[in-house]
Amino acid sequence: MNRHADVPVIDISGLSGNDMDVKKDIAARIDRACRGSGFFYAANHGVDLAALQKFTTDWHMAMSAEEKWELAIRAYNPANPRNRNGYYMAVEGKKANESFCYLNPSFDADHATIKAGLPSHEVNIWPDEARHPGMRRFYEAYFSDVFDVAAVILRGFAIALGREESFFERHFSMDDTLSAVSLIRYPFLENYPPLKLGPDGEKLSFEHHQDVSLITVLYQTAIPNLQVETAEGYLDIPVSDEHFLVNCGTYMAHITNGYYPAPVHRVKYINAERLSIPFFANLSHASAIDPFAPPPYAPPGGNPTVSYGDYLQHGLLDLIRANGQT
């Protein structure tokens, strides 16, 4: 029988209220979770996840091979100039999962960062509206909703780190966030591509990695698949399709000098139709938070200050080099 990691369910609704004692209690629970397994579930978030699952399932099933190719990012379709926004193809005999990634809806042709040609900034392309009515509207609204959830959770992190609850707000804005949503589909296949094995012999759909983000806010189908590395080895992460699964990314680890590490995790092989929809909460290109450690935690030395744009660009490239194109 597989062992489960300790992944608490935390009611985050109090972080939107005015009772500081309640906020401090929630922050303390976030602190324990992130210093423990590295994961927690955010409950009472106010997002209709059942609607998200149905809309995304229906959309994936309606996409044609031709549409996927037309939207495929440059790694798959050299004619497409986009590196982040677009379709990430399944590759027969090599890779089963497929996904569509979209970025900040605020990025349009007149946005200052788009005009400047900054890396990691792209104007979203979408499937044809006539074939997929309401898709763009639905997912732009979801981006706003899950951004707000992440902003609330970051209040808890700020309090847990001994800062004002608004600490992250000036760096995390809908106007210029580099955040992204990925609509990942893992299909059921009669002939699944060859699998990679973990060092413990576990069959894997995606190898061990850390998230390139400040934090990650994930919705997933209630089918067990994720494992987190602990001192006891890899442990299963309990599943829920009612709550968001939250973990720190490597930028949070960097700015806290390792106080909140980015948990190493992996995806087990499960041959079942399911969804994984991460929101990678990213700051703006120019944001740069000076690393610090909450008292009394004070490791020797300290990390250098790194702008978020540089961090994200290099972090994503390193992830692709280590694990291959997603």
From Swiss-Prot:
Pathway: Antibiotic biosynthesis; penicillin G biosynthesis; penicillin G from L-alpha-aminoadipate and L-cysteine and L-valine: step 2/3. InterPro entries: DIOX_N, IPNS-like_FE2OG_OXY, IPNS-like_sf, Isopenicillin-N_synth_CS, Oxoglu/Fe-dep_dioxygenase_dom, Plant_2OG-oxidoreductases. Its cofactor is Fe cation; L-ascorbate. It comes from the Bacteria. Fe(2+) binds at residues 209, 211, 265. One of its GO terms (molecular function) is iron ion binding. N-[(5S)-5-amino-5-carboxypentanoyl]-L-cysteinyl-D-valine binds at residues 84, 88, 186, 209, 211, 276. GO terms for biological process: antibiotic biosynthetic process. Keywords: Antibiotic biosynthesis, Iron, Metal-binding, Oxidoreductase, Vitamin C. Pfam families: 2OG-FeII_Oxy (PF03171), DIOX_N (PF14226). The keyword Metal-binding applies. It catalyses: N-[(5S)-5-amino-5-carboxypentanoyl]-L-cysteinyl-D-valine + O2 = isopenicillin N + 2 H2O. Its EC number is 1.21.3.1. 2-oxoglutarate binds at residue 274. Residues 183-283 form the Fe2OG dioxygenase domain. Isopenicillin N binds at residues 84, 88, 186, 276. Removes, in the presence of oxygen, 4 hydrogen atoms from delta-L-(alpha-aminoadipyl)-L-cysteinyl-D-valine (ACV) to form the azetidinone and thiazolidine rings of isopenicillin. Belongs to the iron/ascorbate-dependent oxidoreductase family. This is Isopenicillin N synthase. It comes from Flavobacterium sp. (strain SC 12,154). The lineage of its organism: Bacteria, Pseudomonadati, Bacteroidota, Flavobacteriia, Flavobacteriales.
